[in-house]
UniProtKB/Swiss-Prot annotation:
Keyword NAD: no
Full protein name: Glucosamine-6-phosphate deaminase
Active-site residues from the entry: 63, 129, 131, 136
Enzyme Commission number(s) of this protein: 3.5.99.6
HAMAP family, per the entry: GlcN6P_deamin
Length: 234
C-alpha cells in the first residue's frame, strides 16, 4: 500500500490524475472504474481539463441508487454525465440500472459486464464508517455486485444532495468487495478531517468487515491519496 499525503483536495486529485494518465497513455488501462460523491469531483474536473485521450477507455461505476431513473438529477448516471461523460469521450460506460425490477438478474448482468471488462484502475472514495462503494460495515469480503440496504449514517451523509430527507433512497446496487478487489490497481481518495478516523482504521487497523476499506490491506497494488486533514490521525 503506497501512501501519498498532499496539501489539499486539488493537489491530491492531480496526483491521482497523473497515475491514471500514465496508465492510459501506456496502454495499460483499458477499463477505468469510477466512483461518485463529492470526493472524486475535482479529479473529474481535472480529467476534463486535461489532454488525456480517453476515447478508447471503457468505464464502469461502483453503484447506483435503486429506484432512480438515469435522467433523475439525483442518480449516479446523471452525476457521471454532468461531471464527466458529457465533457469527455469514452469508448463505452457502464453503471448498474437503478430501475431494474429483478435485483438478482441485474446484479448478475453487472457482474458479467465486469468479467468482460476487467478493471485496470479502480477509483474509490471512503465513507466515514469505512464503506467503499455502498458496502457497509459487516459486508462479506466475498461479496459480488448486490442490492444493499443503506445505513442511516450513509443516508444522512447523502441527504444534502436531495431536496427532502424522505427522497433519499433506502437501497442501492453496489459492486461487492470482491468485485472491487478484482481491480488490478486501486486508488483510494480521502479528503477532510471527517475521513481521518476511517483512514486510520483502513491503514492501521485490523482487516475486519466492520471497516470494509480495511480489506485494501490485502490488495497487491493500492495507492492511498490523502490531504493533510484526512491523514491527521496516522
Amino acid at each position: 500500500m503506497q501512501l501519498i499525503t498532499t496539501e489539499n483536495k486539488l493537489a491530491g486529485s492531480k496526483k491521482a490524475l497523473e497515475i491514471i494518465e500514465k496508465g492510459i497513455t501506456s496502454g495499460e488501462v483499458n477499463t477505468l472504474g469510477l466512483a461518485t460523491g463529492s470526493t472524486p469531483e475535482t479529479l473529474y474536473a481535472e480529467l476534463v481539463k486535461s489532454d488525456v485521450d480517453t476515447k478508447n477507455v471503457t468505464t464502469t461505476n461502483l453503484d447506483e441508487y435503486v429506484g432512480l431513473a438515469a435522467n433523475d438529477p439525483n442518480s449516479y448516471h446523471y452525476y457521471m454525465n454532468e461531471l464527466l461523460f458529457s465533457k469527455k469521450a469514452f469508448k463505452e460506460s457502464f453503471l448498474p440500472n437503478g430501475e431494474a425490477t429483478d435485483a438478482e438478474a441485474e446484479c448478475a448482468r453487472y457482474e458479467e459486464i465486469l468479467s468482460e471488462h476487467p478493471i485496470d484502475i479502480q477509483v474509490l472514495g471512503i465513507g466515514t464508517n469505512g464503506h467503499i462503494g455502498f458496502n457497509e460495515p459487516g459486508t462479506s469480503f466475498d461479496s459480488l455486485t448486490h442490492k444493499v440496504v443503506l445505513t442511516d449514517s450513509t443516508r444522512e451523509a447523502n441527504k444534502r444532495f436531495f431536496e427532502r430527507e424522505e427522497d433519499v433512497p433506502t437501497h442501492a446496487y453496489s459492486m461487492g468487495i470482491k468485485s472491487i478487489m478484482n481491480a488490478k490497481k486501486i486508488i483510494l481518495l480521502a479528503f477532510g478531517e471527517n475521513k481521518a478516523q476511517a483512514i486510520k482504521e483502513t491503514i492501521k487497523g485490523p482487516v475486519d468487515v466492520n471497516c470494509p476499506a480495511s480489506v485494501l490491506q490485502n490488495h497487491p497494488d493500492v495507492t492511498v491519496i490523502l490531504d493533510n486533514e484526512a491523514a491527521s490521525l496516522l
